[in-house]
Amino acid sequence: MKKIVIAIDGHSSSGKSTMAKDLAKEIGYTYIDTGAMYRAVTLYCIQHGFFEGEKIKEEELKASIHDIDISFRLNAETGRPDTYLNGVNVEKEIRGMEVADKVSPVATLGFVRRALVAKQQEMGKAKGIVMDGRDIGTVVFPDAELKLFVTASPEVRAKRRVDELEAKGIPASYEEVLENVKKRDYIDSTREESPLRQADDALVLDNSHMTLEEQKAWLLEQYHKAIGS
């Protein structure tokens, strides 16, 4: 059976990561969470004092960008990959609100995106991957055999994010998360470097009122169509 690249783009907290993880597990592909990579760089910046309020010290980050090693290792308990920053498991830290509030300024930096896109393209050379993010189908893998664009209303996405954080033992305010979701939508859609946009040949899924099982069935149907089975 031929292996392909599956690119899943969409808004923050649209459920695309859960969908991508479940699909990868179901079909035996490798899952790569590009959002986690940008969050890991953001955590590195926080740890090294590269923020002055909302502003990032660009020159200091640029000088350190090649010292940042991001990898994914399978968590035997969850059956899903955890994110490692320079050899340390940071899966819980990168999901907190402090990182969520600061990730957009980091992700808008051209040199950060170029460094991570190069790493993502290297990861996908052998195919057999499911990669989710904001610019996978438009920038990272414009020739991906299957492109999907996932969306949902800001209110639905904020509720999902709160539920996800609380399930991990991270306290969260719905109003604060909703404000963060809307702010990230604006920044992601208007930034100069690789803005969030739907690829012309992407299949669109609005999952505002779909169950996880309905989403999974739809995804598998698109996958089998793409590989011709």
Swiss-Prot record:
Its EC number is 2.7.4.25. It holds the Pfam family Cytidylate_kin. InterPro entries: Cytidylate_kin, Cytidylate_kinase_dom, P-loop_NTPase. SUPFAM superfamilies: P-loop containing nucleoside triphosphate hydrolases. One of its GO terms (molecular function) is CMP kinase activity. GO terms for cellular component: cytosol. Its main location: cytoplasm. It is an enzyme of class 2 (transferase). It comes from the Bacteria. ATP binds at residues 10-18. It is found in: Cytoplasm. CDD domains: CMPK. One of its GO terms (biological process) is pyrimidine nucleotide metabolic process. Keywords: ATP-binding, Cytoplasm, Kinase, Nucleotide-binding, Transferase. It catalyses: CMP + ATP = CDP + ADP; dCMP + ATP = dCDP + ADP. PANTHER family: CYTIDYLATE KINASE, CYTIDYLATE KINASE/PANTOATE-BETA-ALANINE LIGASE. HAMAP family: Cytidyl_kinase_type1. Belongs to the cytidylate kinase family. Type 1 subfamily. This is Cytidylate kinase. The gene is cmk.
